[in-house]
Each structure stands twice: as C-alpha cells, then as structure tokens.
Curated annotation (Swiss-Prot):
GO terms for biological process: L-histidine biosynthetic process; methionine biosynthetic process; purine nucleotide biosynthetic process; tetrahydrofolate interconversion. InterPro entries: Aminoacid_DH-like_N_sf, NAD(P)-bd_dom_sf, THF_DH/CycHdrlase, THF_DH/CycHdrlase_cat_dom, THF_DH/CycHdrlase_CS, THF_DH/CycHdrlase_NAD-bd_dom. Homodimer. It catalyses: (6R)-5,10-methylene-5,6,7,8-tetrahydrofolate + NADP(+) = (6R)-5,10-methenyltetrahydrofolate + NADPH; (6R)-5,10-methenyltetrahydrofolate + H2O = (6R)-10-formyltetrahydrofolate + H(+). This is Bifunctional protein FolD. The gene is folD. Keywords: Amino-acid biosynthesis, Histidine biosynthesis, Hydrolase, Methionine biosynthesis, Multifunctional enzyme, NADP, One-carbon metabolism, Oxidoreductase, Purine biosynthesis.
Length: 299
C-alpha cells in the first residue's frame, strides 16, 4: 500500500517570488521619486538570535533595493533614548518602515515603544491602529507572520470559505491577528491555547490548523484531521543528544506529513514569508507616502 505524503507549502520559493516583484516595483518607482524605500530596525543588546534575525532582514532589504537604517543600541539603553530615536525616525522622510526587534531587555517597555511608532510606518503591523483596522476589515499594514500565512495559502489556491480553522496560540504577534485574518476570509475560527481543555479534540476538527504556540512538537499526527492543511508557525531551537542545535516547529512534521493534505516545513515555510511581508509592508508605506506627496501619480 502506497504511503501518502502531504504536499509542501513552500514559503521559501514564494518569498523569493515576492522579493523579485518588489525589486521590479522599487526600480520603477525610485526612478520617479528619486529615493529607495527605507526600513529602520532597532535592536537593543546582544541577543544572538535577534542579531541573526536582524542580519537576515538587512540582507533581504539589500537584495530588493530597500535602504537599511539599522540601529544597534547597548543593553543599558534607556526608554527615553529609544523613544527619542523613534520620534526622529517618524519624522525622517527617508524612512518608510520602523521595526523594534523583540525581545527587549526587561527594563524597557516594549508595548510603549511599539505604540510610539507612526501607524503608517509600522512595518511589523503591531500598532493598535493597524490591529484595529484589521478588526474592522479596513486597509492597513498587517502583522507580517499571519499575513505571510494567508499569502502562502492563497498561492496554493487553498479555499478558506466555510472551513473550520483552528489557531493554536493567542499571542498579539501571531495568534490573535491570525484568527482575525482567517475570519476575514470567511473561515469558522477557533482559538486554542495552553489552557484549552482537550486540545486534541479541538484540533481534530480543523480543516486548517495553524500551530503558533512556541512549543516544539506540540501537535502530533493523532491530533490532525486526515486531509487537513497544517501550517507550522513555530520556530524553536532545540539541542539533540549529540549537542547539536537545530530549528524545529510546533508540529511533529514527519508523522503529520502522512496525514495532512498540505504542510509547511521548518525551516523554509513561514519564516521566509514573514520577512517577505515585512519588505512588502515597507514598500506599501513607501508607495503611500509617494502618492500623498504627489511624487507618484497612481490611479
């Protein structure tokens, strides 16, 4: 009997496609308005994972033609210093997107800093104004990871209308905006989390299952409905018996691949899509600024 294997939702390939589209768009618009889009990434301290993420973002910016205004601050940087930097970036006409790399040192108020970013420069889509626009179904900058999930599902023409969707995780970064985006696409949405009773019975009903709890291997094959679409948002670094570290998601990929219809890998699934949508948000802000200034005549 032939063993069924789920089709891979290839985020890496789609992210490269999006980057090529953005590159062409930037070349065309820059010739008209005289400057490239700009993204400022603020990092505080020396968290190795954060440093790697920032390098990846800056590399991706360079690839598509976005100017990077990266700022790296020492661990002891004060709240006021960062607030002053954000205030200046809000006024800087060369900067279209601002991102505060999380996590921040404990003495800093991350929420207050995120709220200070001008909503139209909120590259991460986490400002209350942009989240409010999402709730209302209005246009606005969307949270990058869930927006990346939606773009990936659309690329593979996976219909969401009327489907049962379960999101495991309720963070403001992924879980909550993910549920809202699925709802906006006419799915029937359930949010589960670490306090949910009988998680298995909830996930087994999902036509679309999004794992975003940050717990390696949380979702196993017996928790998945046969033929479901399984999206793994988790990025967890684990160490094996030989002391080697590797990235894994929130699902048991090997076993679930024999049950699901579609599945995302880690790495190579949602991670590249998150970066691609960050670039997309920056370019969206860039185009909007150009239109408002009259430098770009777009219908």
């Amino acid at each position: 009997m032939e063993t069924k294997t789920a089709k891979i939702l290839d985020g890496k390939t789609l992210a490269e496609k999006i980057q090529k589209e953005l590159t062409a768009q930037i070349i065309e618009v820059q010739a008209k308005i005289g400057r490239p889009p700009g993204l400022a990434v603020l990092m505080v301290g020396d968290n190795p994972a954060s440093a790697a993420y920032v390098r990846n973002k800056e590399k991706s910016c360079a690839k598509v033609g976005i100017a990077s205004f990266g700022k790296h601050f020492p661990q002891e940087t004060s709240q006021k210093e960062l607030e002053d930097v954000i205030a200046a970036l809000n006024q800087d006409e060369q900067v279209d997107g601002i991102l505060v790399q999380l996590p921040l040192p404990e003495h800093l108020d991350a929420v207050k800093l995120l709220h200070q970013i001008e909503p139209d420069k909120d590259a991460d889509g986490l400002h209350p104004v942009n989240l409010g626009r999402l709730v209302r179904g209005e246009k606005g900058l969307r949270s990058c990871t869930p927006a990346g999930v939606m773009r990936l599902l659309a690329e593979y023409e996976i219909s969401l209308r009327g489907k049962q969707a379960v999101v495991v995780g309720r963070s403001i970064l992924v879980g909550k905006p993910m549920a809202l985006m699925l709802l906006e696409a006419d799915a029937t949405v359930t949010i589960a989390h670490s306090r949910s009773q009988d998680l298995k019975s909830i996930t087994q009903n999902a036509d679309i299952l999004v794992a975003a709890a940050g717990l390696p291997g949380l979702i196993t094959a017996d928790m998945v409905k046969p033929g479901a679409v399984v999206v793994d948002v988790g990025i967890n670094r684990v160490t094996d018996a030989n002391g080697k570290s590797r990235l894994v998601g929130d699902i048991n990929f090997a076993s679930i691949a024999g049950v699901a219809e579609y599945i995302t890998p880690v790495p190579g699934g949602i991670g590249p899509m998150t970066v691609a949508l960050l670039l997309q948000n920056t370019v969206t802000s860039y185009l909007q600024t150009a239109k408002e200034s009259g430098a770009l005549d777009v219908k």
